[in-house]
């Protein structure tokens, strides 16, 4: 993700000029919540490694370190001030505190998976860290899944550009990864929607059963 004025030519120049630093800070800023096209810069780093301008290991380490640092920043922002801010926003939109507490509980149950797999989903990679902080996931647990997810994501992303960059253009690689990331987001939204529909129907069914039993003559 990123602002439109970050043209591919500009990003390529940044990657060539600053190398590992561009990869590190690009993905760190994106994971911290700033809309910098960090994933694209990481792909460019892998592409440059494939052409011999950078080393594969250096790009991989920079991507992992940047992703872990960025998500950790988001975690602490969420932990220190995220819940009060979210509570005030809920009051502004007349969202009951009970609903907010339920959402917090649900995320705390599935937060580890969100932190690990959120790397591969556009938007979720930005919000997983702050949400983990808001629900007060233990930092040790968060860091474990953060490092694990960052390592898998970086290995796939850098390797994809490193190897495929020898046979296809970097523009095509970026297009493929962007499409996959949006598809993953759509899949997550779809699954969440199905869950809430199922939960709603189950609640209505239980209410109907209770009403039927209550209406029976004693």
Swiss-Prot record:
Keyword Protein biosynthesis: no
Transmembrane segments: 27-49, 57-77, 115-135, 142-162, 180-200
Signal peptide: none
Subcellular location: Cell membrane
A GO cellular component entry from the record: plasma membrane
Keywords in alphabetical order: Cell membrane, Membrane, Transmembrane, Transmembrane helix
Pfam families: VTT_dom
Domain of life where this protein originates: Bacteria
The keyword Transmembrane helix belongs to this UniProt entry's keyword annotation: yes
Membrane topology (UniProt): Multi-pass membrane protein
Family of the protein in this entry: Belongs to the DedA family.
Record protein name field: Uncharacterized membrane protein slr0232
Organism: Synechocystis sp. (strain ATCC 27184 / PCC 6803 / Kazusa)
